[in-house]
Structures are given as C-alpha cells and as structure tokens.
Amino acid sequence: MRGASVFLLAALAACSPGERAVAIPSPSSAVTVPRTSSPTPTATPAVRYVAIGASDTVGIGATDPVNGSWPARLAALLPPGSAYVNLGVSGSVTVQAKDAQLPGAVAQRPTVVSIWLAVNDMNATIEPASYRDALAAIVNELVARTDAKVFVGNVPDLRGVPAYQDADKVRLFALITAYNDVIATVTKGHPGRVVLVDLFIGSAPLVSTITVSGDGFHPSDEGYTLIADRFATALRAAGVPLRP
C-alpha cells in the first residue's frame, strides 16, 4: 500500500508545489446567517455549523474561497440566524486536524459538523490504519462532547484528476478503496449521529475538466457547487433544515 502512496505523492508534488497552511476564517470571524424576519414559535431552529478539513474545505481553487468553498455554499442554505465556522487548514492531514481543529470545533457547541479529510493523508503516505485512528479520534470526540450530527465525506474516484495522470491507476484505485472502507467503518460506529457523505459513487462529474481548477488538483467553482450539493442532500436526509 505504501508504494501506491509514493505514486500519489509524486503526482501531487508535480501539480501543486509549495502549498502553505492557511486557515480561513478563524472562529472569531464566524459567519451568522441573517434573519429575514422575526422569529415565531414555529420558526425553523437555527443551526450551528462547523467545517473541519483541508484545502478543499478552505476553498482553494474557487474564484472566491471564503464564499465559494463548498462549506460556504452549504452554509448559505442554513435557516436564518444560523452560525457557520470554517476551521479548515490548507495542507492539513487528519492527525493535524485532530490537534488543531477539533478543540475549536467542540468549543463552538455545533449542531452540525462536516469532515472531509483523506486525500492529503493519501499523498503523505499515511497508512489507512493510521488514518483510521486519527479520523475515529475526531469523530468519537465530537459524538462524546457535542450534540452535533457529523457528516463525513469519502474520497471521489481521483483517477481522472489531472494531478494523478502519471499515477498507477490500479494502485490508486486500491488506495482510494482502502481509505473509503475506513471511512465507512468509522461512520457506521455511530448510527444516527454520524453520516457518510458518498462522493465516490457517481463521482465522474466531480472530477471532469470543468469541475477541476487550473492547478489540476483542487475543485473549481463548478466542482465546489457539486460537492456542496452532495453534502446538502445528506444533511436534508438526516433531518437538518436547509433552504431550497
């Protein structure tokens, strides 16, 4: 499995050099969805949404990362009066997110949390077992210390992404499958609280030419729209109130 990771690391290095860790926005710059009318006894409850992730959570590749990332697009669908905090850090692997993002997420007292972390771990040659331990630690802590519903995205089929054009596609697919098996196992451990957001099945539109940005790796505006749609579908199915 480690050999497959070396192929991924080489491909990423060729297409996305020098990526620095940048977090936006901080909890102090959380966004509150404006109220459009005075609350009534039948008003839809507000949501406290926190996003945990890496550069795709930050919105790298979008024309306007702050407003065009997939979490920001998802937050735009929240009921009036809801709060949204994006804790994503570009370049983060899952164990780093556990240390740097999880405490802030718990402190926000969220009712909804999204997690999308995996590809950087794959590119960093982190074995699936180690990835599992880090992801499970994040999920278990959120379940134990918050009342949030947690939505965890898996890995799309990356074989058509330009950054992986020189990777061994058989090994790449095997590694994606191993990581997605881990994500499925972790999410199944908390039925009713943790939901798998499947970005793999039918993922061809997510990795088409128009949905990948000019760097050949991160999503474009069109890609972030499709990712937000996948998460929105999962949130609605789990009973989270979202606007049409």
Question: Which role does the model predict for each range below?
Answer:
Residues 96:
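Active-site-proximal substrate-binding core of FAD-dependent oxidoreductases
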Residues 16-19:
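Bacterial signal peptide processing site
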Residues 1-7:
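Bacterial N-terminal signal peptides that target proteins for export
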Residues 88, 92, 117-118:
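Cell-envelope and extracellular/periplasmic
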Residues 76, 99-244:
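Alpha-helical cap/lid subdomain in secreted, periplasmic
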Residues 11-14:
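C-terminal motif of bacterial Sec signal peptides marking the signal peptidase cleavage site
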Residues 24-90, 102-109:
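Serine-esterase "nucleophile elbow" of acetyl-processing enzymes
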